[in-house]
Amino acid sequence: MKLYCLSGHPTLPCNVLKFKSTTIMLDCGLDMTSTLNFLPLPLVQSPRLSNLPGWSLKDGNAFLDKELKECSGHVFVDSVPEFCLPETELIDLSTVDVILISNYHCMMALPYITEHTGFTGTVYATEPTMQIGRLLMEELVNFIERVPKAQSASLWKNKDIQRLLPSPLKDAVEVSTWRRCYTMQEVNSALSKIQLVGYSQKIELFGAVQVTPLSSGYALGSSNWIIQSHYEKVSYVSGSSLLTTHPQPMDQASLKNSDVLILTGLTQIPTANPDGMVGEFCSNLALTVRNGGNVLVPCYPSGVIYDLLECLYQYIDSAGLSNIPFYFISPVANSSLEFSQIFAEWLCHNKQSKVYLPEPPFPHAELIQTNKLKHYRSIHGDFSNDFRQPCVLFTGHPSLRFGDVVHFMELWGKSSLNTIIFTEPDFSYLEALAPYQPLAMKCIYCPIDTRLNFIQVSKLLKEVQPLHVVCPEQYTQPPPAQAHRMDLMIDCQPPAMSYRRAEVLALPFKRRYEKIEIMPELADSLVPMEIKPGISLATVSAVLHTKDNKHVLQPPPKPTQPTSSKKRKRVNEDIPDCKVLKPLLSGSIPVEQFVQTLEKHGFSDIKVEDTAKGHIVLLQEAETLIQIEEDSTHIICDNDETLRVRLRDLVLRFLQKF
């Protein structure tokens, strides 16, 4: 069993597991932190960004200053943002049989995999994962395509040039794998390969293994996966949460008795309490709008935004914010808000029960009905007419490199009355803000990450007790910025096995058993013989038939009778010849009794010699030797087949036949 690690980002995993002749890809996350090296894509022409000075090497490379721009001491690539793809050279991705998706954040690289690697398999995901994943991809494509940029930068990627660039460009990894965004045509083609599954549904893969999705408690439709054969079990835990938010709670019991547990997608902010962050978010939001400022919340169109809107629903009246407009701008805003209300079966029990009252599971439906929350596809059209300040605005993208958020950063960034509140943990807020410096608006960092922290992981591992734990190397050591915090790493026995990007891990357990079925008529023919009190044995002579990784013992074909006809058989009528099977023998030969038997049958001049492994019986008159050992008996005589058969029959009297 081998694990191929194709991604270096622990919360955006992409691994390939080879198990029992099947090749299974576990997630295909897309590392978007690479976009932080690029200049933002403004919806409206930005004189500030257009007039940034070019950056070039000291040798005065004239072409480089067209690709690189400098802003407040940072250097950025002036080109369409590119994304860091999973490894495509470590393993032939056309050999991947299936892709298992754990949540909608971990499928953003799917079109790159399914459309450009020769992949012909099936993708398995829950319905909310597929539908919300579609929304995230559609939003991403829309953000990139609506701001066409003619310039494409590639000179800076040359290894000899890159090493001379300032950080973080100098330290950017795998820049040769960075690619532009896919198209909607590729998105639709990739999604057409998805087969929808439900929690606890068992899916057979080629008769070799069975895969089962379990609720992971993190997002709508998010899953952990069990991959098991009859005698081995692998658990894949990715993006899980024990907190009570809107999804179904995490299924922990099904993870027990795992031979290997692959652990990814832990919280990116292990020292931040999500509840505390939500409280800080609300208080900073209220403080800003009371002072006449606007609040900008960069976010994804699904996930944490549902919980934030629910908290604000309970908070706005008590905080005196009833008259403050809330705006949600995204090309998929309407679809996202509607989807959250119709996936009732994937919600926690409290929200499920509201559906039957009937009430909407999420309170943002009421916020929309009362006009406290308005949603728009973009800043153009209706939004321009309805827009009033001060306001609270939710929009994408959290990287601040594309989307409507770029426009509002340019619009509001010069006033200290305004505040930007970061709630998504995927991007460094300091790096996200770098191309907008100098910035007057206030910045609040309230990362809300409900995924498992290290304390919860330690408790989980003690409860489910896997034989082996496998995880990214980042989880086996404290974070670089907090090297003294030994509690911010996985602590388990035996120690976790770690992996890094482009590494192949041989997992430390070997298959020992295989399940074989036996045909009823063959079972009927077995005659067990008691060899010890309470222990019976029966020999099985059969044909092993294997198809689709299922093994069946069938009765052997009867020996074919020779026919005088010389007529040729058709190929498909050929049956393998079956020789008459010799019985298996067991037992031991008592030498003294055997010698007496030989004498009774006319043999004389018998001599017995002891050897290291047994005895040798010499028949001197017949010039024959019988070698008796613990696990074999040999009759050695000189070209006298009649004598050999007589002696064989006498030996067989002392042995049991099966």
Curated annotation (Swiss-Prot):
Gene3D superfamilies cross-referenced by the UniProt entry: 3.40.50.10890, Ribonuclease Z/Hydroxyacylglutathione hydrolase-like
Region span, Disordered: 548-572
InterPro entries, sorted: Beta_Casp, Integrator_9su, IntS9-like_C, Metallo-B-lactamas, RibonucZ/Hydroxyglut_hydro
Extent of motif Nuclear localization signal: 566-570
GO cellular component term of the entry, any: cytosol
Family per record: Belongs to the metallo-beta-lactamase superfamily. RNA-metabolizing metallo-beta-lactamase-like family. INTS9 subfamily.
Main subcellular location: nucleus
Keyword terms, alphabetized: Cytoplasm, Isopeptide bond, Nucleus, Ubl conjugation
Organism: Mus musculus (Mouse)
Function description: Component of the integrator complex, a multiprotein complex that terminates RNA polymerase II (Pol II) transcription in the promoter-proximal region of genes.
Name the record gives this protein: Integrator complex subunit 9
CDD domains: Int9-like_MBL-fold (cd16294)
